[in-house]
Amino acid sequence: ELTKSDERYQEALEKRGITDLDLVQIDPWPAGGIVHETIEPGHRALKAISFLRENETDNAYAKPITGVISHVDLTLQKVTHIEDHGVVEMPKAHARYDADSQPKLREQPKKIDITQPDGPGFEVEGNLISWEGWQVRASVNPDEGPVLHQLSLDGRPILHRVALSDMVVPYGTADPMHSWKAVHDGTEYGFGTLVNSLTLGCDCLGEIHYMDANM
């Protein structure tokens, strides 16, 4: 809302023929290593980029509003600068992938049965998983996502705790819309907070055991 209510931002959209702000989706991004000079050192900063939807269910990422970046000082809760690199034509075709918006793409695949008549080869007791002499405890936390604890083989300790600490995604392009992007997906967004719930009989086939994740 800080960006949408800024007159400079509204003027940049009007140059592109966009007047209905309800159809504009704004994505806040970490400011990266290049913070705009209008934001004081030590203040929390982000850069906001925008996308246009035809309606509330549209895939906004198909229509980026290229050239416009909003610099936001989160400490002061205000937009300090609107960067405008000029009007770039927006794709006209929609990119919705729901069944009602797409033609029939192919015949339905043949049914696949994955069975283990004698049951699975693993055992689960609480968060303890046992398989082929291996034992490991599993959990999920908001930052790292899946975490393995006390991994052992035939009673011999191998790892006390192992997890993915972070993942850095540098975009690696000179384009001003992307050159500053170097996202830390773990520490800035949280692997665990972005996990999806799985449904038995839908997401996986075979002898499946789902575990609860408490964060």
Q: Which role fits each region the language model picked out?
A:
Residues 4-215:
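Beta-strand/loop-rich accessory regions of lumenal/periplasmic or secreted enzymes
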